[in-house]
């Protein structure tokens, strides 16, 4: 186990199976996981639980990942929590969706993107890098 | 002066004088601000390049198309078409757009073939000319009106040009043939060539004279040969002489300074050569045909683009759904692997459940896709709707109960068996019920009502919930294929499929929904069998 293990990860995804997947990957890396099934619940859990990192799905009904991310960054208590965004949004819109374009929408960019379907090794590696830095 | 004119799409301003240069893109700092998700912030620039202008893509994500071809940098010519995202623009070198008929000049000093206006022939018939002048003017107005009316109505260019050629034979009473060539307007971008021959006159299989077409399209000049036989300069134009033509005229089809093709009228009648007046009328008619041809081309382009966009939307939506299912399958099998490694049976079961659930979702998605695309005639048979609705409700009851959502079937009176396609209606109602249950939270209820309207011979199925309801912007798109509010869980096909099933039954589908007031979908279906099916075997 590295220094980056044993951290608290908040997983925000409307799809319970996707939450279970990320939970399994994070627990395998030695982290603890709390989860939320939507943007509003995610923001509330972030305030209540002070996670070390947030894994946030883009495509959610109600408050989507973009909006949730923008609100995280506006909240002084939460703004410094690193965010890994799970995205398939480029495919959804049928366009080359660059990080610059994402910046256009939300003013700021998350620390990392991981594409769905999630590659467990890549997700674990990205999280380890962000928490170990 | 160079100018960009927005033909289609969101942009500000609608027209832009280019001057030394201009940048187009989504950023408010651009000279021409174009909206839409396919447009990059600084998408493309147009700039003065020597004597002319050039266009250069600024590394945009989705590229720039000029006259139908992708390009990174190209010289621009008057009338070029530029596509940036969903926006279509045309580049004009003259700010004063001149309609084709006035842009065209007769050139009396043309050195070859046919600038001949046979004044001698006209002088001989001077008295009849005066007498028929009023009639001729009226005929001109009539033909112009007829052509422009048809130009507005017909978007199929071949049909339009045929009508215009018929009109030419009507107005030029001495004409035996009328021909048109539209360059690149045919199948596979071949030239479209059309000819008409006056009834009872010999056909002219050779079509338009290549000599005249060359002059009209290369030099952009209208051409008149008043009396072919009397003009020894026509020796080169064998195609005219060999066909026993006595008089002929030809006009280019011009759109701005772009040549779309040409029209030609000819006669084998030695006594009635065409006059300069006739040529001027031909030029005016050519202007109308050119506008119509351009409209038709634009229409075809827009349809092709819409089709491409729809296919792109469908493919990307499906790809997204499939990716989500793959994510589930991958996640499930990852958890199964961990369980196997640790000999943790609970984990294996948990992972395996995820795999099964996602395989099931994929299976439902494929069924929806096939049902949505299938083009089979519905088979309507007398069906006990109460039984059908009861069965369908049972299919969602377990999920509803788990969420704490109540369900009920309410039947008003004793509805007679209705003639429906049971499979289609069941799938439609199941989709509505699934949506309703998903939209509801604990304590809400979902109800299916069945009511018969004996007076109108129709039945109405209503699926009602007291969930969160829909905002107007959601309501407006809710039946669009691939529109979904369910995030990763939705294919966006469910309600589009409901609509398709109802349309196949010649029924009616309506939605009442307000935010905070729940939603109600009403399906009206004709209860009796359609006539052709009722009288069939």
Range-by-range predicted roles:
Chain A
Residues 60:
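Receiver (REC) domain active-site loop signature in two-component systems and cognate sites
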Residues 49-55:
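Active-site beta3 strand of CheY-like receiver
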Residues 13, 57, 87:
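Active-site residues of response regulator receiver
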Residues 12-13, 36, 54:
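Conserved sequence signature across two-component system core domains
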Residues 1-8, 115, 119-133:
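Non-catalytic signal-transmission and effector/linker regions of two-component phosphorelay proteins
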């Amino acid at each position: 186990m590295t220094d980056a293990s044993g951290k608290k990860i908040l997983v925000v995804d409307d799809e319970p199976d996707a939450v279970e997947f990320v939970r399994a990957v994070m627990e395998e890396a030695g982290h603890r996981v709390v989860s939320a099934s939507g943007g509003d619940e995610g923001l509330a859990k972030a305030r209540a639980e002070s996670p070390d990192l947030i894994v946030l799905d883009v495509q959610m009904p109600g408050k989507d990942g973009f909006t949730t991310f923008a609100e995280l960054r506006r909240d002084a208590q939460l703004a410094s929590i690193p965010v890994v965004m799970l995205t398939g949004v480029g495919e959804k819109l049928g366009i080359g969706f660059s990080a610059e374009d994402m910046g256009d929408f939300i003013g700021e960019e998350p620390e990392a993107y991981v594409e769905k379907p999630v590659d467990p090794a890549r997700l674990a590696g990205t999280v380890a890098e962000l928490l170990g830095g | 002066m160079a100018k960009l004119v927005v033909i289609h799409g969101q942009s500000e301003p609608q027209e832009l004088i280019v001057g030394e240069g201009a940048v187009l893109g989504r950023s408010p700092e651009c000279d021409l601000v174009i909206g839409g998700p396919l447009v990059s912030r600084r998408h493309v620039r147009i700039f003065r390049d020597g004597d002319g202008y050039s266009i250069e893509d600024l590394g945009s994500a989705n590229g720039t198309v000029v006259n139908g071809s992708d390009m990174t940098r190209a010289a621009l010519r008057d009338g070029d078409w530029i596509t940036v995202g969903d926006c279509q623009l045309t580049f004009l070198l003259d700010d004063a757009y001149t309609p084709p008929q006035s842009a065209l000049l007769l050139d009396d000093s043309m050195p070859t073939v046919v600038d001949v206006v046979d004044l001698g022939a006209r002088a001989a018939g001077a008295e009849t000319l005066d007498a028929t002048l009023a009639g001729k003017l009226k005929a001109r107005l009539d033909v112009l009106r007829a052509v422009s009316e048809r130009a507005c109505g017909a978007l199929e260019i071949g049909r339009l040009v045929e009508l215009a050629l018929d009109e030419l034979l009507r107005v030029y009473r001495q004409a035996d043939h009328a021909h048109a060539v539209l360059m690149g307007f045919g199948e596979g971008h071949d030239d479209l060539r059309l000819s008409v021959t006056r009834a009872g006159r010999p056909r002219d299989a050779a079509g338009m004279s290549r000599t005249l077409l060359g002059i009209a399209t290369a030099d952009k000049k209208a051409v008149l040969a008043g009396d072919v036989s009397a003009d020894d300069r026509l020796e080169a134009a064998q195609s005219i002489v060999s066909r026993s033509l006595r008089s002929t005229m030809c006009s280019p089809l011009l759109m701005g300074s772009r040549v779309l093709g040409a029209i030609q009228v000819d006669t084998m009648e030695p006594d009635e050569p065409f006059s300069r007046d006739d040529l001027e009328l031909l030029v005016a008619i050519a202007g109308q045909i050119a506008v119509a041809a351009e409209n038709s081309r634009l229409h075809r382009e827009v349809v092709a683009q819409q089709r491409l966009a729809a296919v792109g939307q469908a493919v990307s939506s499906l790809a997204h759904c499939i990716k989500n299912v793959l994510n589930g399958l991958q996640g499930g099998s990852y958890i199964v692997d961990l369980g196997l490694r640790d000999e943790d049976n609970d984990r294996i079961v948990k992972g395996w459940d995820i795999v099964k659930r996602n395989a099931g979702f994929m299976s439902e998605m494929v069924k929806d896709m096939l049902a949505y695309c299938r083009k089979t005639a519905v088979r309507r048979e007398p069906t006990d709707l109460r039984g059908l609705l009861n069965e369908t409700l049972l299919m969602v009851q377990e999920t509803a109960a788990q969420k704490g959502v109540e369900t009920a079937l309410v039947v008003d009176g004793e509805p007679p068996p209705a003639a429906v396609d049971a499979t289609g209606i069941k799938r439609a109602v199941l989709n509505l019920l699934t949506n309703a249950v998903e939209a509801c939270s604990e304590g809400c209820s979902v109800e299916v009502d069945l009511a018969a309207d004996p007076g109108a011979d129709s039945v109405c199925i209503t699926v009602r919930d007291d969930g969160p309801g829909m905002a107007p912007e959601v309501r407006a798109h809710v039946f669009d294929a691939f529109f979904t509010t369910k995030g990763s869980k939705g294919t966006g096909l469910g309600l589009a499929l409901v609509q398709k099933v109802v349309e196949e039954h010649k029924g009616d589908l309506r939605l009442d929904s307000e935010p905070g007031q729940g939603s109600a979908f009403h399906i009206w279906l004709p209860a009796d069998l359609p006539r052709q099916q009722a009288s069939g075997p």
